[in-house]
């Protein structure tokens, strides 16, 4: 049997780190490059500074193994596709490597981008590599070798991080009639083997292969494949020590399978699924067990005493127990330091990225030097945990009693056919009605007004006047274009979740808590720390103003309870189902107020419905039960004549298709443009009988599709959905596009609808 490589074991590390910059420097630099305002050299200088500062901070904090190659201009799966020579042939005409990379990510006028979808059950999106018959895997290691050299040149104990071959293929997509990508696994082993030798030659002592797919049910053969692949990779004579990282759940049978290979280290997520039973895997003896006891996905301070108890149970099960985050800190903000508005109690409960690194170092020190060496830190942790438990903001008996009463009486609407008849009589819409999802471009005037209000340069009345002017222009634009159901454009909203969080009790909105959603898109998730309630109406004033400007229906726009949870940092001291119902009650009250104000169409967005779906099938039914229940609680307070819409994002919908039907929304809009309407076959198969709008163009690309292209998409949709139930819309909100792109695209979309209506 191949023997493990003997390298100095590490004791304190993290799985990965963010790359956007503490002040979103990379976002600004890449967007400047795309717009032609920033040169290549300026972009690369920003990237180099971010890498250097990140590595230096991690090493200075006390990590004895620092992840590198976690920097990305856009996405780590796209980086891996470049590494393996697996970019789609359609980007080959772009001669420049960086521009070719961005063409695959964003598309161009002539090139469609790669499909985008959620990274497991997180709010990060990855680009889906396409594996076709012509795909030939070849190694292109320039990026990882250059970053390794950079880090070693700084004296950093660098550990390159690379998506592992099993995860890469299981998350890729077959195209052009090719078989399942995982069938190509044997072809990847020589490429990864070559990479190992080059990394060793470049000075790498350790390499990390990320294999989160091993905690899922994506392939029943994954454990056996992992054993075979990593046994083969360990046979490379000239290689670094190999650390295989699993995260986002329990690796189950994959853990002993990996442990039977000669890999030197295995990482487990002890926050999201794995437990101390991993200590019972005898093959771990002689290896490093990397224990993910510090939560890399949520913002709550680690209970150091509990974590040390877990670590104590693991000691002796492996040659070394190293302390780590449960996953990359990509998913949490950089640091608590800029959050000057936090009250002392709430601050004491939290840990962002920098604080989590310190927690890792403290725990590793406790293992090395004994608990007395970190007695002050343990006492501080104990006090914070106790403070949180007794804070009165965490329990509102009145809200809990209302939820119990509504759930007991049944949160359901009337018969769908009766609702449709009532809504048709009220709305008088044409066949194939056109609409948009909600948001319109956030113009410079909007951003200036928001900044001026925040700085105290204008008062609330002036801010409202400016936002009303934006709404007036958006309504006028939609009427000129000929859309049938309008939206107010959401100029007053900084984010579809944060806007509501700022108005709901039980939330705290951060000042600088940015995390990457995809590419240059950053979000600032609010912190849901206590029981949720709605002190006052949140949207009625804006929507009724918009409705006063037109005779066409204007949609009320709300975010659904599951999405608010998915895109927030949620309290971890009670079941998610209970928290979802509290948010749902607040949304329910808002829908009733909108209806009372005369709004006939209300959209309750659930783009993240699938995002919280547990990775193991055995756990999914219970989640879908309470997620659907929360949506129905939020939407069942209105009459049959009020049309409820919902919107769903970036998903492999087949896994939740029954739940989509169970939501019982009158109209469901779905992101289907990048996946070529595939979801409609799934809906058709289950007899989905309500309205559906399967996104006729992809708003995440600057490309403006032609009217004929969208008409073709509509004709394809009509093969699965009858005309009386088909809606015409973009596949998502338009906030991230500019006005010219939106105007041209919507003009073509309306023209496409008219062409198809005319037959």
From Swiss-Prot:
Binding site for L-homocysteine: 437-439, 490, 605
Catalytic function, reaction form: 5-methyltetrahydropteroyltri-L-glutamate + L-homocysteine = tetrahydropteroyltri-L-glutamate + L-methionine
Active site (catalytic residues): 700 (proton donor)
Superkingdom, natural source: Bacteria
Record's compositionally biased regions (Polar residues): 1-16
EC class: transferase
An example Gene Ontology molecular-function term: 5-methyltetrahydropteroyltriglutamate-homocysteine S-methyltransferase activity
Cofactor details (free text): Binds 1 zinc ion per subunit.
Cofactor(s) listed: Zn(2+)
Listed InterPro entries: Cbl-indep_Met_Synth_N, Cobalamin-indep_Met_synthase, Met_Synth_C/arc, UROD/MetE-like_sf
GO CC annotation: cytosol; peptidoglycan-based cell wall; plasma membrane
Region (Disordered): 1-22
Enzyme Commission identifier(s): 2.1.1.14
Amino-acid positions noted as binding L-methionine in the UniProt annotation, renumbered to this chain: 437-439, 490, 605
GO biological process, one term: methionine biosynthetic process
Family note: Belongs to the vitamin-B12 independent methionine synthase family.
Name this protein carries in UniProt: 5-methyltetrahydropteroyltriglutamate--homocysteine methyltransferase
Gene symbol of the encoding locus: metE
